[in-house]
Amino acid sequence: MRVLYIHAERFSWDPRDPALDIRDEPVSGSASNALVVFVSVERGDSPDEGFLKAVAADVVETAKKVGASSIVVYPYAHLSTDLARPYTAREVVGKLYEVVKAQFKGQVLKAPFGYYKAFELKCLGHPLSELSRVFKPEEAKTEKRAEERRDYYVVLTPDGAEYDPAKFNYAGLDDFKALVEKEVFKRELGGGEPKYLDYLRKFGFEWEPMSDVGHMRYAPEATVMMELVEDYAYMVAKSLGIPVFKIRGTNMFKLSEYAIESHARLFGERLYVVESDTDLILRYAACFQQFAMVKDWVISYRHLPFGLLEIADSYRHEQPGETVLLFRLRRFYMPDLHIFTKDLKEAMEVTFKLHEVIFREIGKLGRTYVSLYNVTEDFYKGHREYLVELARREGKPILVRILPGQKYYWVLNVEFHIVDELGRPREIATFQIDVGNAQRFGIKYVDENNQVRYPVIIHTAILGSVERYLYAVFDTMAKMEKEGKTPRLPTWLSPVQTRVIPVSKENLKYAMAVADLLEAEGIRVDVDDREETLSKKIRDAETAWVPYIIVVGSKEEAEGTVTVRERGGGQYKAKAEELAKKIREEVKGYPQRPLYLPRLLSQRPSRH
């Protein structure tokens, strides 16, 4: 933050034309014997209380030194070439004004943000009448750390006991201990190159070097896997037993809208901002679109609870060194489900079912979660037994982070972590109970007494983002390989579920007939018709993790059978119809998509 102090005999201002979409009310004003504080908010500045108190203390001290009877906080963008985004600058200036007002006994005024303004100033001209300052957020780090210490952690067990994390016995709870080490004691865990990155290359999950850092591209194999998970996310949402509406919307929103701007401030510099005729942000989840849509619905208490799901292309400006393929991205796809409930009591009841489904789905991968519950202190005091019940349902301790004296739009924010093959906790699924955004966006319903109410909203990603769910799948494969097992993708998620390999050209027609039969049953099947040896074709299919490799030669053709090599299993003969039935049973309850590649391998260009 850069500041210019002018001790003025008199100072007045008059707003003229708007300069920004984000702006205050156009109020004129004047002051005499004033310390005028011209403020440029820079990138990296934040509305942190400790930082603003440090700035305000200097402002007030300077006013006292020069004998000013009033202070004017004046937003002024011309002291820096590295300005913060308008929504951040407006908030910082507004909060600085409030902090100065609380510290100074005289008159404190603020000129409006977001306008071209005419002003008149008569500087007193004494040695201290013109001063400049540069303030950096890190100068307030001691006070900031003191504020952070107000957050504290407890371990809550299924029997309702509460423990200091430093004194808890973690015997037999290695994954939970890893979570506590990371979250409470801030210790870096694991190291080395994760094995799953090797797997991603074969399926076409890659960085896009011609885009921004943290943006991916998806080859055909990766694309079908992504879309299958998107389809499955909707199926899982419907399994909650409440009405679910699937929608689609835009990814850009105007910062001039109060609801958008106030919600966006929570993300600060992590936002993607698009400079156009108006300032736009790229959404970081589906919240904006779903809330903007539902505010226009006429909702009765009889409709509640219900959910909205969108596969939201989401954008978060992660630091370049933090991006990790498939796990931490700047652009990703979020199957974001928002559940609208009558009140906090109903929201908590719905989360019991939600919690069950979240654990059910990770269990299908042979994994489980360790959980971090972020709660406001008031919620913890008032609903501790609810958290104990969730711990009972998990059957193991949970880590609770308690945030005293702080106001959030949520009262509970739960993070569900797997522990990866390197021993690191990795957040996948989540849910939170939101008590603030319905009012912020104007979402209302009419209750039994014909009174207008604001619903309580549950935010959840049951599977996590599409990419993080797939990360969990591939990390499971890495754990399998580490244990000496053959990695095998779930058949429903395998880009190619069966590959038919003819022993010779003479068997190609029969191979195609087998492929036709399997494809008619909704099975993704391709045919290796290349001029390669049988052993190489089989090796290539195994390298591609095809779960069912079918070999057909003259003998199989004469018998009307196929020879099946099952990944991680044995080899056997079967009728093509029998194999189709087996695969159909295996993928029952999961979505189907066709093959996203040419059936014949000879028609596919090779990839580097």
UniProtKB/Swiss-Prot annotation:
Keywords of the record: Aminoacyl-tRNA synthetase, ATP-binding, Cytoplasm, Ligase, Metal-binding, Nucleotide-binding, Protein biosynthesis, RNA-binding, tRNA-binding, Zinc
Record has Metal-binding as a keyword: yes
EC number(s) per entry: 6.1.1.3
GO biological process: threonyl-tRNA aminoacylation
Pfam family membership, one: tRNA-Thr_ED
PANTHER family: THREONINE--TRNA LIGASE, CHLOROPLASTIC_MITOCHONDRIAL 2, THREONINE-TRNA LIGASE
UniProt xrefs under InterPro entries: aa-tRNA-synt_IIb, aa-tRNA-synth_II, aa-tRNA-synth_II/BPL/LPL, Anticodon-bd, Anticodon-bd_dom_sf, DTD-like_sf, Thr-tRNA-ligase_IIa, Threonyl-tRNA_syn_edit_dom_arc
Chief location bin: cytoplasm
Needed cofactors: Zn(2+)
Signal sequence interval, chain numbering: none
Note on cofactor: Binds 1 zinc ion per subunit.
Region annotation (Editing domain) ranges: 1-143
UniProt: Zn(2+) binding residues: 287, 338, 459
UniProt function note: Catalyzes the attachment of threonine to tRNA(Thr) in a two-step reaction: L-threonine is first activated by ATP to form Thr-AMP and then transferred to the acceptor end of tRNA(Thr). Also edits incorrectly charged L-seryl-tRNA(Thr).
Species the sequence originates in: Pyrobaculum arsenaticum (strain DSM 13514 / JCM 11321 / PZ6)
Record's protein name: Threonine--tRNA ligase
Family to which this protein belongs: Belongs to the class-II aminoacyl-tRNA synthetase family.
Subcellular location: Cytoplasm
Free-text comment about domains: The N-terminal domain is an archaea-specific tRNA-editing domain that hydrolyzes incorrectly charged L-seryl-tRNA(Thr). Catalysis of tRNA editing is performed by the charged tRNA itself.
Subunit structure: Homodimer.
Gene (UniProt): thrS
Catalysed reactions listed for this entry: tRNA(Thr) + L-threonine + ATP = L-threonyl-tRNA(Thr) + AMP + diphosphate + H(+)
Region (Catalytic): 194-490, 195-490
Gene Ontology cellular component terms for the protein in this record: cytoplasm
